[in-house]
Amino acid sequence: AMAAEANTISVRGIAKQEVAPDMAYLTLGISVKGDTAESVRTQVAEVSQKVRRALLGMAISENNIQSSSYNLYPDYENVNGKNKQKGYALNTTLRIKVDDLKKLGDIIDKTVQEGVTNVNQVSFALSEESNVHRQLLAAAVDNARAKAAIVANAGGRNLGEMLSADISDYNGETMVAAGTNYKRSLAADVAAPTQLMPGTLKIDASVE
């Protein structure tokens, strides 16, 4: 074992690439308050239905529209130093997969017009990320082999076969616009259209 360890070289190969995203995940929030639990449930149901209709009208598939949370709770106010329940509040979120980034700004504007109160998160991604990652892994192996060859040649040895590989995680998603709040008003009708600049995704892979 000692001899085998003495004849091994441990190196780390790295490969990186920046790519333009071609899809996004959009998390929309609907928040309402009312006197009764039934009233807030009704309000949210009506807004959710309008938002879904708007999304379907923009060619967003039903399969790409998912409810991700639904929280109903008492709404309190402070009266003379004491908390007094004045009604109920309900928050729900929808997670939307957007395959056409050109539609992203219009989707946000249209759903806000239909009652969405929060854009909680926008994350950009690459539909073919797994293919890019496989290419980067191969490049990382080549990078590691080149480093090992330099060390072996410097020591007067020939490089043999790779004995083991430890693959690290990689990151290929970027998030923007977390916690953006929207208030419906007359001014919103003349506001400039929402524009988001996705930039590039940094994907990396390493082999050790």
Describe every region a protein language model picked out.
Residues 1-114, 118-208:
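Short, charge-dense linear interaction motifs
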